[in-house]
Each structure stands twice: as C-alpha cells, then as structure tokens.
Amino acid sequence: MSSDPQAVSGKSAALAGRTLVVTRPQEQADSLCRRIEVAGGHTIRFPVLAIAPAPDTAQLEAIVPRLDEFDLAFFVSPNAIHHALDFVLARRSWPAGLRVATVGKGSERVLLQRGFLEPIVPQDGFDSESVLALPEFAAAAIRGRKVLIFRGDGGRDLIRDTLRERGAQVEYVTCYRRYCPQLDPAILLQPAARGELDALLLTSSEGVRNLALILGGEGLRALHDVPVFASHARIAVQARDAGFAKVIETPAGDDGLLQALTKYFG
C-alpha cells in the first residue's frame, strides 16, 4: 500500500496543470488517465503497444479439451486472461481442479472479476522473479506438475525455463499478439516543441522500443529532456539506453506511478 494517501486517491495538487503522456495499450489506459485527470493533470494517450487476438487459434483450439490434464494455469497479463478465458469459456467450463496464477494487481483484479476467488499472485513483486519465489512454484511443490502458460507472442521465457528445471512439465498457449501501432509522431512532437510535455510514462520494455520506432531518431532526440517514469528496472535501463536524460524508476501499477509523480512534481 502506498505511504502517500494523496497519491493513491488522486487528490494531490502536485499534478495540476501537468501534461503526462500515457503509453499503455488503449484498452488498459483508462484507469490511469482518469486518476491523473482527477488530480488535475492532462493526459495525452499515445499507445505505443497494440493488442489483438492471436491470428492463429490452433493452440487455443487444441488446449480446450486438454485443460483437465493440467494442475496450474498461469496468465502473464490481463490481456492473456481476457483472450484465453473468452475463447475457452465460450466452449467449455473451467475445470474445477485447475488452479490459476498470475502476476500484478491488475491481473489479479481481472481474475477476481472473472470469478476465480483464490488466484495465486505474488504480493511483493510484479515480475517473473517474484512469481518464481512463491512457495507454489518452489521445486518441491511444482516437480511433476503440469503447468499451462497463457501468453502473447514473444516475451520472456524465464518462468517456463525455471519451472522445467524444477521438474515441471510446461506448455505455452499464445492467445494474443502485440504489435507496434501506426501513430502520428506530431501528437508528441508538437507539444514537446512548445515545452508542454511534463512526463512520459513507460510501462513496458517493448513500449520503449516501439516509441523509438514510431518517433524515429530525430523525433526521439526531441524528447530526451522530458522526464520518463519507468515502472520497472528493466524499463528504466532501456529508457536510459534510448537516450532519455531523466529516468525515474517507480513501483509497478497505478499506485506506484501516481506516488512517484506526486513526489516528483510536489
């Protein structure tokens, strides 16, 4: 829980009049934008990552009748939950004995909303390492178990590889794809030229790469002096490597971002 109740509630005056660029996928930006705007800030939505259903549903089709074989299903993100469950539950009920796990408060909230009352979720971290530190994923608990990972195309393989080393049988199912959308760089470059951008909020490593692709080298350099708020150490490293001069690492999630923004601008 945040130690700054104003940052969490959105009632601080620190963001009043500030213009913040939210780069999350369109479907996931509403809550954060709303909280910034309640705090008096302005948001520019610039979704550097787009999400779509997997173009080939063969893996999903094949896994539906086999779900009862598995002991644990891990969803890598809210997108994985939505795309996998929409597909599966249109064809069958979820097996009573198949436990679910995920990472991040947003993903946990989605599972609870979907009716999974006791998802396995790390409370002290928001990455693969925090998942692997859970007792349910320890070698003694996972050895011999069959684990299904619902994910997008690409991404880190750390959970799969580590669980296999610990003796689990692990299968992937790709249920959505991520891609770099076509956006007009002028949406950012024009206000930046007028000195009207106060911060960029970057919440994925892939988003940093896509931002560079969308803006091009000259466009990216035009933003190098805009403060960047990065919600993970890996994202912060990529932002610095991309040339941003001021990178503030924040805790993951909306609360962490808002707390860091309030502290910086307060």
Region locations from a protein language model:
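Conserved beta-alpha
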Residues: 1-266
